[in-house]
Regions:
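Short, Gly/Pro- and small/polar-rich lid/capping loops
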Residues: 21-29
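Active-site-surrounding "flap" and adjacent substrate/cofactor-binding loops of secreted or lumenal enzymes
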Residues: 35-39, 44-111
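Noncatalytic, helix-rich "gating/capping" subdomain that lines the substrate-entry/channel surface
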Residues: 83-375, 379
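Bacterial Sec-dependent N-terminal signal peptides
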Residues: 1-21
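Hydrophobic/aromatic-rich, well-ordered segments within soluble, folded domains that form packed cores
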Residues: 30-51, 182, 186-206, 396, ...
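Short secondary-structure subsegments characteristic of cysteine-rich extracellular domains
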Residues: 58-80, 212-231, 501-507, 603, ...
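Intrinsically disordered, low-complexity linker/terminal regions across diverse proteins
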Residues: 69, 256-259, 278-282, 338, ...
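Short, solvent-exposed loop/turn and secondary-structure capping segments
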Residues: 28, 52-56, 152-154, 178-180, ...
Length: 676
C-alpha cells in the first residue's frame, strides 16, 4: 500500500544531510572574504568551503548536510554491526536487525538467485484472466509491497476533523512521480523520459522477457502512465489544501467511481469496513476508471508487471541495481553508486526505524541537549509572540487567534516517549531478501491500517525517526518536531556562542514554527482543523505580503534560463523568511538579557555570526541535473537561494553587513516581505 497522507507535513528539506564546526561555531576557513557580502553572501560566507569540497562521484550534491548524513550513516552502521557480526537469538530485535543487514549485504546470494524470487508473482500477473481479476491481483500484490496500483491509498488525519483519522485515495501510479516528466518538452525532461523508457525495457528483460516483448510492455506502460499524468495535478495545484479534499461516504465512492472494484480493493489491502473517505484528486481517479475499461488486458498487465519489477529491483541481483543506477545518473547527475553498506544500512534504518532510533539516542544523544533545545524553542515562541503583537497588518482578532495557535504548539524533541513494537515483524535468513521485504512490507502495511482506520489520531506518534537529519511541522496536529540527529553541528552545538546556535538551530525552529502560519498552515487552527480564523482584510494583507515572495523568488535563476517556481516554493520560503526574523528577534532578546554576550568574536558581531551560521547550514555544491530536478519537483528552493535570496528579504541583514543600494543583492524596502 502506498501510504497517502491527507495533508503533508512541512519539513526543513526534502532530504537532509552538515559539517563539523570549531568551538567558536564559525570556521573562518569556510569563508571567502574576497567576496563582497552584499554582492554574493553565499560565496562570502562559505566560498572557502565550496572550493575545498568539490563534488565526488557518489553525490549529486554535497554540503554541511551531507557531511552530517555521512557521519550518521557510519554511526548507524556501527550500531547494526553489533548485531550482524555474530549470531543473535531468533526473534529478538538484534536478530532482525542483523539478519536484514546481512541479507542486504549478501550480493553473492542475490546474484545467484537472479530474478527467481520474483517469478511466482510475475506469473500471477501473467495468469490474470479478466479485468476484475486484474484489479484484485494488483491490490493483493500492492499490499505486499509491489506498487502495481494506478492511484495512491492510505490513512491520515481528517483535515476537517483532525482528532480522527480518515481513509484517503488520490493520484499516483507514475514511475517518475511528477506529471511534467511525461508532458514537458524541456531538454532535461526529455532526456529523463527517454532514460525511463529504456529503464523499463531493461528491467523487463532482466525479469525474463525477450527484447521484443519487453519493448512492447515498456511502450504500453509509458502510454498508460502518460494518460495518468495528463489527468493529474501539478505540484503547485497540489499545494491548494481545499482543492485537494473531497470527503464522501464509502457508498458515494462506489456510486461516483463505479469503474473500480472498491470492495475487493479494500478487502485485499486489509482494511476493515469504514464509513467515509477523502478522494484527494477526482480527475486522476476517473481517468484510472477509463484506463481499466479501455486499455487492453495485455497492456494493463504490462503496466502491472513493469511496476512490480521496478518495486522489487532494489532487492534483487546487481544487474537490476545497475539499471536503477543508470536512470538515477540521468535524473541527478550522480556518477557512482552508493556502496552496498550504505544501501544496506538505509534499508535497515528504514524498516526498523524506531528500533535503530532507540539505539541511536541511547548512544549519541545526551539528555542535556534535549533540555537546552526545549529552552531554545520557548525562546523562539516568545520571539514569534512578540512579532505577532507588533504586526501592523493584522487586526487584534486575528492576532489573538494566532497567539492561541502558537501557545498550543506540540513540541517534540529528540525521540518519542514510546517506541514502536516490532514483535510481529519477522526476518528469516532462509528466505531471499525480496521475500523478506514482501513479508515486512505486508506487516508494516497491516500494522499501519490496524492502528489508524476508524481510530483517533495518535498525537504522540512521530513522522520521522530520531536518526533522521530533518525537522517538520504538521498542521493537523499543530506540532513541531526536531529529531535527535539534527541537534548536532552546524545546526546545534552546546559549546558555541548563542549567535551561532540561533543562526543554525534557531533558524530551523523558527522555520518550522512559521509553517504553522504559511500559505497552507495558516488555514489550520490550533486543533489542527482546516478552519478559516482570519478576517477577510487580514487574509488579503497576508496574501499581498506572500505575493512579494512569490514574485521575488520567481525572478531568480537557479540554472541558466531556468528560474525558481515561486508558487511551488512559497511555503518553504515563508518558513525561511519567518524563521530568520523570529530567531534573530530571539537572539536580540538574549543579548538584551545578557549584555556580556554582545561581543565580537574573530572580528564578527553577534548579528554577523548569526547570518554566517545560517549560510553555513546551507553550504554545498550541487550538480545541474540535481538542481534541475529540484526546481521542478521540490517545494524547497535550492541551497544558494536559501541564502542569497532569503537574506535580502531580512532588514537586519542589511545593517549587519552594511549592504548598500548599489550592491547586487540589494532589494528595495517596499519589495521585502514583512510577514512573521
Amino acid at each position: 500500500m502506498k501510504v497517502k497522507s491527507i495533508i503533508l507535513a512541512c519539513s526543513l528539506l526534502a532530504t537532509m544531510s552538515a559539517s563539523a564546526q570549531t568551538s567558536k561555531g564559525i570556521d573562518l576557513a569556510n569563508m571567502n572574504t574576497a567576496a563582497k557580502p552584499g554582492n554574493d553572501f553565499y560565496e562570502y560566507a562559505i566560498g572557502g568551503w565550496r572550493k575545498a569540497h568539490p563534488l565526488d562521484a557518489e553525490h549529486a550534491r554535497n554540503g554541511s548536510f551531507t557531511d552530517l548524513d555521512e557521519m550518521n550513516q557510519k554511526r548507524i552502521l556501527a550500531l547494526i554491526e553489533e548485531y550482524s557480526s555474530k549470531p543473535q537469538p531468533k526473534g529478538t530485535l538484534g536478530q532482525k536487525i542483523g539478519s536484514l543487514y546481512n541479507l542486504a549485504m549478501d550480493s553473492v546470494r542475490r546474484n545467484r538467485e537472479g530474478a527467481e524470487p520474483l517469478k511466482p508473482l510475475l506469473k500471477k500477473i501473467n495468469d490474470i484472466a479478466d479485468r476484475r481479476e486484474y484489479q484484485l491481483v494488483t491490490a493483493q500484490l500492492d499490499a505486499r509491497g509491489l506498487d502495481c496500483l494506478m492511484f495512491g491509498a492510505g490513512v491520515g488525519a481528517d483535515m476537517k476533523d483532525a482528532a480522527n483519522n480518515l481513509v484517503g485515495i488520490g493520484q499516483g501510479g507514475l514511475g517518475l512521480g511528477e506529471r511534467d516528466y511525461y508532458l514537458s518538452d524541456d531538454a532535461q525532461v526529455v532526456a529523463v523520459r527517454k532514460a525511463y523508457a529504456e529503464y523499463l525495457k531493461k528491467m523487463l528483460v532482466l525479469a525474463g522477457n525477450d527484447e521484443a516483448t519487453a519493448q512492447r510492455k515498456a511502450d504500453a506502460t509509458m502510454r498508460i502512465e502518460t494518460r495518468i499524468a495528463k489527468a493529474s495535478k501539478g505540484q503547485v495545484e497540489l499545494r491548494d489544501v481545499q482543492a485537494n479534499y473531497h470527503k464522501m461516504t464509502y457508498n458515494a465512492l462506489v456510486k461516483d467511481f463505479p469503474g473500480i472494484d472498491w470492495g475487493n480493493f479494500f478487502l485485499a489491502q486489509g482494511f476493515p469496513p469504514f464509513s467515509h473517505i477523502d478522494v484527494g484528486q477526482l480527475e486522476p481517479i476517473h481517468e484510472v476508471e477509463k484506463i481499466l475499461a479501455e486499455e487492453s488486458l495485455d497492456d494493463l498487465k504490462a503496466y502491472a508487471e513493469s511496476h512490480a519489477v521496478s518495486s522489487a529491483a532494489g532487492y534483487l541481483d546487481d544487474n537490476f541495481r545497475a539499471v536503477e543506477f543508470e536512470l538515477g545518473k540521468v535524473m541527478s547527475g550522480v556518477q557512482q553508486d552508493r556502496p552496498r553498506w550504505k544501501r544496506a544500512t538505509a534499508l535497515v534504518s528504514g524498516v526498523l526505524g524506531e528500533a535503530i532510533g532507540k539505539l541511536y539516542v541511547e548512544r549519541y544523544f545526551p539528555e542535556s541537549s534535549k533540555q537546552q533545545m526545549l529552552q531554545l524553542v520557548r525562546n523562539l515562541q516568545k520571539a514569534l509572540s512578540q512579532r505577532i503583537d507588533e504586526a501592523t497588518w493584522m487586526s487584534p482578532a486575528t492576532k489573538a487567534q494566532a497567539q492561541d495557535k502558537l501557545a498550543n504548539f506540540i513540541v517534540k524533541v529528540g525521540y518519542p516517549d514510546t517506541w514502536k513494537d516490532y514483535t510481529n515483524l519477522h526476518v528469516d535468513e532462509q528466505l531471499s531478501l525480496f521475500e523478506n521485504m514482501q513479508n515486512i512490507r505486508a506487516f508494516l502495511s497491516q500494522d499501519y491500517i490496524s492502528r489508524k482506520v476508524n481510530k483517533p489520531v495518535d498525537k504522540a506518534e512521530w513522522q520521522m525517526t530520531p536518526q533522521t537529519v530533518n525537522a517538520y511541522y504538521n498542521p493537523t496536529t499543530n506540532e513541531i518536531c526536531f529529531p535527535a540527529a539534527i541537534l548536532q553541528p552546524p545546526f546545534f552545538d552546546p559549546n558555541v556562542d548563542e549567535a551561532v546556535n540561533y543562526g543554525g538551530i534557531g533558524g530551523v525552529i523558527g522555520h518550522e514554527m512559521s509553517h504553522g502560519f504559511d500559505d497552507q498552515g495558516s488555514q489550520f487552527d490550533k486543533y489542527g482543523n482546516q478552519n478559516d480564523w482570519w478576517t477577510a482584510e487580514d487574509k488579503k494583507n497576508f496574501e499581498a505580503r506572500t505575493k512579494v515572495l512569490v514574485d521575488y523568488f520567481s525572478s531568480i535563476e537557479a540554472l541558466p534560463g531556468k528560474k525558481i517556481n515561486g508558487k511551488l516554493t512559497l511555503g518553504e520560503n515563508i518558513g525561511d523568511n519567518g524563521g530568520l526574523n523570529i530567531s534573530f528577534r530571539a537572539l536580540q532578546n538574549v543579548l538584551k538579557e545578557n549584555p556580556a554576550l554582545n561581543k565580537s568574536i574573530d572580528g564578527f558581531t553577534p548579528e554577523q555570526r548569526f547570518f554566517l551560521s545560517w549560510a553555513t547550514v546551507w553550504a554545498g555544491n550541487a550538480r545541474p541535473e540535481f538542481i534541475d530536478r529540484q526546481i521542478k519537483t521540490d517545494p524547497h528552493s535550492p541551497a544558494e537561494a536559501r541564502v542569497n535570496a532569503a537574506l535580502p528579504q531580512i532588514d537586519a541583514w542589511y545593517k549587519a553587513f552594511n549592504v548598500k543600494k548599489s550592491d547586487k543583492l540589494f532589494v528595495p524596502q517596499k519589495k521585502r516581505a514583512q510577514i512573521w
